Amino acid sequence: KQFNNLLKNKYFFNTVISNVTNIVELVNKKKSNAVILNYDESLDNFLKWYQQLLAESIGKKAKGIFPIISTMPKDNHSLMQLYLDGQKNNFYTFFSGADKISPKINKETILRSKNFLINKNLQDILDSKILATQKVFKKKKIPFRSFFLKTRKEETLGELFTFFVLETILIAKALKINPYDQPAVELIKKETNKILFNS
């Protein structure tokens, strides 16, 4: 029922189509690395699923989108220089979400030079980091999109699963790829069975 309702939702459907169009255009311009910037650790398992979905569905016939999960903000200090100033063959997806209220920083726990952080909490700092990163991406004309989860209800995750399955299928169709099989992986299975049978 929820799936049918989503398909009837013009905003949802138009958003899927818009994202598919943009991604196919980027892939055709040789931007085939999909860097997933994850600012919400509760999405770790979901994003591993998304990575698998994208890799196994699109990676065929010498084509593909290489999904790379980047753990943020940790990777701000190790990989962001590459993202901003390295090869221009990436496009980016920001994932973030509303967090539980964290304690505010008080003046007793901070250096005077950082007084501007007083009464801010960790979520405020993280949100500022995300916004700053996106502003720099825009200035440098680096392609990106952003998903923000207001809640983590089952319904929200169901919408995300539906969105990315539909998006992946339509990208595959646009690239003239069958998204439903894994012929190369089958070769490894066959070779493994041969080795085990003959050993």
Explain the meaning of each model-derived region:
Residues 53-57, 87-89, 111-115, 165-169:
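Short, low-complexity, polar/charged sequence segments that are solvent-exposed and flexible
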Residues 68-153:
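Helicase-primase coupling helices
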Residues 9-14, 94-104, 155-166:
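Short flexible/disordered coil segments
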Residues 32-37, 64-65, 113-119, 148-150, ...:
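Glycine- and acidic
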Residues 1, 124, 128, 144-187:
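Short alpha-helices
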Residues 18-29, 56, 81-84, 128, ...:
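Short, hydrophobic/amphipathic alpha-helical patches that form generic packing surfaces
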Residues 1-93, 101, 181, 185-199:
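Active-site phosphate/pyrophosphate-binding segments
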